[in-house]
Amino acid sequence: MRFTRLRLNGFKSFVDPTDLVIHEGLTGVVGPNGCGKSNLLEALRWVMGENRPTAMRGAGMEDVIFAGAATRPARNFAEVALVLDNADRLAPAGFNDADTIEIVRRITRDAGSAYKANTKDVRARDIQMLFADASTGAHSPALVRQGQISELINAKPKARRRILEEAAGISGLYQRRHEAELRLAATEQNLARVEDVLDQLAQQLSTLARQAKQAARYREIGEELRRAEGSLLYRRWREADLARTEALAILRERMTAAGQAEAAARKAAGARAEAEATLPPKREEEAIAGAVLQRLTVERDTLAAEEDRARATIATLVSRVDQLGRDIEREAGLNRDAAETIGRLEWEREALETAHEGHEERLAEAAEAAREAGAALGEREEILSERTEDAARLSARHQSAQRMLVDSRTTLARSEAEAARARETVEAAAEAQERAAETWEEAAAAQEEAQERAEAAEEALVQADEARAEAQSREAEARAQRSAAEGEANALRAEVAALARLVDREAQAGSQLLDRIQVEPGFEAALGAALSDDLRAPEVAADAPSGWAALPDYDETAPLPAGAEPLAPHVGVPEVLRRRIGQIGLVGREAGAALQPLLQPGQRLVSIEGDLWRWDGFRAGAEDAPSAAALRLKQLNRLVALKRDLEEVAARAEGARQAHEALQARLAQLTRADQEAREARRAADARVTEASRAAARAEADRSISGGKLESARLAVKRYEDEAMEARARLREAEGVASALPDLEAARAGLEDLKMAVEAARIAMMSRRSLHDELRREGEARVKRRQEVTKDLSGWKHRLETAEKRSAELAERKAETEEALREAAEAPEEIAARREELAEAIEAAEERRARASDALASAEAALRAAQEAEREAERQAGESREARARAEARADAATEALQLAAERIREETERTPQQLLEALAVDPERIPTVEALETDVGRLKRQREALGAVNLRAEEDAQAVQTEHDTLKAEKTDLEEAVKKLRAGIQGLNREGRERLLTAFEQVNASFGTLFTHLFGGGEARLVMVESDDPLEAGLEIMCQPPGKKLSTLSLLSGGEQTLTALALIFAVFLANPAPICVLDEVDAPLDDANVTRFCDLLDEMTRRTETRFLIITHHAVTMARMDRLFGVTMAEQGVSQLVSVDLKRAEALVA
């Protein structure tokens, strides 16, 4: 399978439909930071089945949906499509029915993800297995994101094993083994459950036999129990009938006594009311005296608090003076310490300068010695290189001579055999050429017909796209209008509901008049000021104690003052308020005070703002808190206006909804038409592709057959010539092999020269180490001298600052001592004020005592009256309770009688008389309830002693036996399934080990070669560690760049680590090439020279594999080596766009 196209729609910053074409070779992606380049890699991983939100750099999977920008609304879905070329038909069986496979993943808010393969719904598991079998997938090492190279470098050996698994192509094998292990565990669990059930069924069979014997005894006890229970029911009914007769007689006596007690209670209540009338004046006097005393007491407590604050201030100032003295002493000590530190630092600076003298001369001498040792080493290495090349050439000549001998003999035998086969091929190729010419003519005609149909389908698709785009635009506008209208309607509904709840909560029981009044908007404050909380009273009858009673109109109504208009035309009130509302006039705020003296009794004036002027001289301004009645009237008017507005907005929202739904239906219809057109276009393209492929195959077959015929003729001549040449080369190789010098003597001389070179290298390294040590010592002294100079400057600055601080502390101490002298005068003033308050408090206490004595006498008289009332009420209450108990007893007796009769009907479906006839006994001879209950209890205990009795024991036993036999057969099947699953898992493990070891050898060999290519020398290899089982072992990387010792990957430099990791990734490609490789800014740590090596390696990979590379980069060298470039831009804030340039075509055009 080959990846050909990646399509994004609404995925992260790619809000518009965007296609990324993936051709053969190197495809580059460039653009500024933050413009969305890495979103392309994440889209590719997402469509291949990635389900971790963190891998998508999000908190939840819905974060991949475009979230909106300044000029773009948020999307409700995101979709990514991946087009695969399956012309080779290498896909799994479920996907291998077409030359092109289109994998689509779509996510919708609050609905989750859905996968489709060529428009058919599939599972995420199927998609993951499809890519796993193709040696790729969401977690493939071939998809290298930013930072993943570092993760590979820092990974533990077992984590690196996943790279080897990808090379072996066993990712899918691991998943299948895991599924088999899950099925094995489930099967073993089912087998255990079946064995448990079989044991339970065996126990049930033995239990059922015992239960059958209990059934007969159970029936006998049941008959006796039914007769005893019937007698008990009748006996209880008869006793309940006698108890009811007695209870009715007692009730009549209690009702007479209760009436007499209630009359005495009413008389005591009148006496208590007279005593209560004398209390209010005495309580008022006592409250006034208490308030005066309280005010004076508060003043005394305040004065005491002031005295405490004054004393606290004095103590604070004294403490502050002491603290400032200590601070001055501390600053003096710090000044002495700073002077000592400055002296010590100056001595150390002089010592460092003395030690540094002569350093440069010693360093130059060591450098010269290191250079001389290096020159000597270079001379010996040059000699070694020449001798090594001579020995290699001699070894190569020996090997070449031997290979020539073997190759000549092999070529002679092969050429003679191939010449004979080529003569046979000439005859078969001539016949095949005639058949291929006929097939090509038929395929060309079919291709022309399919092309005409594809052009017609393309035109229909263009028309459907235009219609759908227009409908989508109109639907978006209608959706916005509907959303706005519904939002306004919802806001009004919420306000109406809140205001309605507030109005309903304030409504009082008894139908207050306030709820029956209608006021013109703007006049609520005027009516509320005129009537205030009187409007909360209900309308009542003429004899009611409180409320609005209806009265006839006045015989003659006094007119309102000139300049005042009646308020009545602006309000609608019930009939009961006509007298009151007719006495209210409406005036301007400036005229009210002037007209108030002209008011007649009962009249009042109000302003529209809420001011009030009454006939008796009272007036209230609108700036006072408005009355509750005025607020409620405004709420009622506001509620009416809101409901009217809500009806209009709701009608408008309903119209917008209908229009939006109509456009939605139209858009759905056009979308279906567009989809059908796309399907038709896709089908036509598929037919064109199939016809083109058939024509191409026919043309290729014709060309191939012609070529085969010509090749076969040439092969006959070539193989005959090769046989003659092979005989001549064989004679020549035998002569060359006998004339070569001795190879072993040359190798021995070369080993001696290597030992001399190694001794020179050790001497050079020693001199270099001495030079480096001198240089480090000099740098350390310079650094310490700079630090000492810096510290010396700092301590001098501290000394100057400390002197200024000491002067400031002395000044603050003088100011604090002055404040202390002023604070010491306050306690004497407070003592004089305390004496004056003591005299006033003594007078107030005498007044309060007199008022309290008078109030106590009145309250004692009231308590006596209340005690008498309570006693009368107690007796009345006891009489009422006795009456209630008698009533309850009578009701209970009646209810008990009814319940007894009802229970008889429920349990026997008979009346009491019918039950007595059924029992056939004399009522007087029926035993007592206690005796019958004893018999019933005894029979129940006997029945309960039998326990649970299964009356269907024999039928149950047969059913259990049948189930037991069925489960035994199922147990045999499960045991067989467990054996098969275990054998399958063992087979998968065996296959995985074999494929993993094979891949290890291939990857290890390729890794060493690529490492040497990238570094220009050196060596590297892979090592399995931590386990003898390849499936559990870790993978360690051992490498030796040129001029360094063999070490692990973690000990290399950053650039070397990156090149080594890339060599490993590409070695995996050579073992099991993935269809696609994405490298996200892997060249960032590399310099220009290493980037050039990296690009050379990419070119080599494109030649040796069919992998298609997608390179995300910022490096100019990498960009220049790409076959084509895609640029990701963000001209519109938050929205990514894709532009492309084909560099190969551009070079061709320039040429």
Curated annotation (Swiss-Prot):
Positions that bind ATP: P32, N33, G34, C35, G36, K37, S38, N39
GO cellular component, one term: cytoplasm
Coiled coil: 170-218, 342-379, 407-508, 633-994
Family membership: Belongs to the SMC family.
Domain comment in the entry: Contains large globular domains required for ATP hydrolysis at each terminus and a third globular domain forming a flexible hinge near the middle of the molecule. These domains are separated by coiled-coil structures.
Functional note: Required for chromosome condensation and partitioning.
Protein name: Chromosome partition protein Smc
